[in-house]
């Protein structure tokens, strides 16, 4: 197995690199703890170069996001409760207490993300309703058209 696509997923994980996005086969957008990284790496094992970008209202990436190629850009979502469960676990593991896991913060981030998805006119995948394997098939079919 050639791991170059896994290396690509690692290098482009969590918005670490926002240049040369045309090299990516797939671009995933979503709030923190929505499932971008597991989906990215799973797709990497299937020979896809995946970049994932966290959507944080304070980062104000709207103009940059408008330049993304829509045919390979996908929005990810989950319920507030699902994201909150993952964020509370993360806070506990890190020994911190912040507004990162509050329902209000998560709701605001989801609203921001969905506004971006609507502006970009991209497909939205609910990872509460679709396993990463199913999401991979869905995305693969969309990008191979």
Each language-model region and where it sits:
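Small-molecule kinase domains that catalyze NTP-dependent phosphoryl transfer to phosphate-bearing small molecules
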Residues: 3-13, 98-135
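Internal active-site segments that recognize and position negatively charged phosphoryl groups
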Residues: 3-49
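Short beta-strand-centered segment that lines the nucleotide-binding/catalytic pocket of NTP-utilizing
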Residues: 50-61
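Hydrophobic/aromatic beta-strand patches that form the interior of the parallel beta-sheet core
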Residues: 51-53, 72-76, 123-125
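Terminal helix/beta-alpha structural elements that buttress the NAD(P)+-binding lobe
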Residues: 54-55, 123, 141-145
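Conserved nucleotide-binding/hydrolysis micro-motifs of P-loop NTPases
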Residues: 57-59, 79-83, 131-132
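A glycine- and Lys/Arg-enriched "phosphate-lid" helix/loop adjacent to the NTP-binding pocket
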Residues: 70-108
């Amino acid at each position: 197995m050639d791991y170059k696509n896994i290396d690509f997923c690692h290098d482009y994980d969590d918005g670490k690199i926002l240049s040369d996005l045309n090299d990516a086969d797939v671009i995933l957008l979503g709030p923190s703890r929505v499932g971008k990284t597991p989906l990215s790496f799973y797709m990497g094992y299937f020979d896809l170069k995946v970049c994932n970008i966290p959507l944080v209202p304070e980062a104000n990436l709207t103009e940059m996001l408008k330049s993304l190629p829509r045919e390979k850009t996908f929005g990810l979502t989950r319920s507030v409760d699902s994201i909150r469960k993952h964020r509370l676990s993360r806070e506990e593991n890190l020994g911190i207490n912040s507004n990162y896991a509050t329902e209000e913060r998560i709701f605001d981030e989801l609203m921001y993300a969905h506004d971006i998805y609507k502006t970009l006119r991209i497909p939205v995948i609910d990872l509460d309703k679709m396993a990463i394997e199913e999401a991979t098939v869905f995305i693969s079919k969309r990008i191979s058209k």
